[in-house]
């Protein structure tokens, strides 16, 4: 779970991310699809899975980073706050929950690349804990 100090670090860092969240989402999803080809199966209905393609950018922007941004405000109750999303991924989309951790790793890599001077060891640890908690909350309906 996230300690109060971790929550403070995440919120402060996320204020810096804010305006670039859409770009970061598209890039993180592009990285995941390129580096972990088995994840392509979930997006096979898209016309183009190339890094930076319109479909990838749109999903990264509207879906992924919106959910992560919303989660920053729900840190005190991620399971409750992400319940509908967890249910969607578990019962309708049938996404293997191990992919949440793969995506969270790619989000961390992308954040580090975009904010090299702000992505300190403290931020890295807090963001990793936060994204791990998001992954656990998204996996809740699989149990």
Swiss-Prot record:
This fish has two hemoglobins: cathodic and anodic. Cathodic Hb has high oxygen affinity, low cooperativity and displays a small reverse Bohr effect. Anodic Hb has low oxygen affinity and cooperativity and displays a normal Bohr effect. O2 binds at residue 59. The modification N-acetylserine is found at residue 1. This is Hemoglobin cathodic subunit alpha. It comes from Gymnothorax unicolor (Brown moray). GO terms for molecular function: haptoglobin binding; heme binding; metal ion binding; organic acid binding; oxygen binding; oxygen carrier activity; peroxidase activity. GO terms for cellular component: blood microparticle; haptoglobin-hemoglobin complex; hemoglobin complex. Heme b binds at residue 89. Red blood cells. The keyword Iron applies. Heterotetramer of two alpha chains and two beta chains. Involved in oxygen transport from gills to the various peripheral tissues. Keywords: Acetylation, Heme, Iron, Metal-binding, Oxygen transport, Transport. Gene3D superfamilies: Globins (1.10.490.10). Residues 1-143 form the Globin domain. PANTHER family: EMBRYONIC ALPHA GLOBIN E1-RELATED (PTHR11442:SF91), HEMOGLOBIN FAMILY MEMBER (PTHR11442). Belongs to the globin family. Pfam families: Globin. One of its GO terms (biological process) is hydrogen peroxide catabolic process. The keyword Transmembrane does not apply. InterPro entries: Globin (IPR000971), Globin-like_sf (IPR009050), Globin/Proto (IPR012292), Hemoglobin_a-typ (IPR002338), Hemoglobin_oxygen_transport (IPR050056). It comes from the Eukaryota.
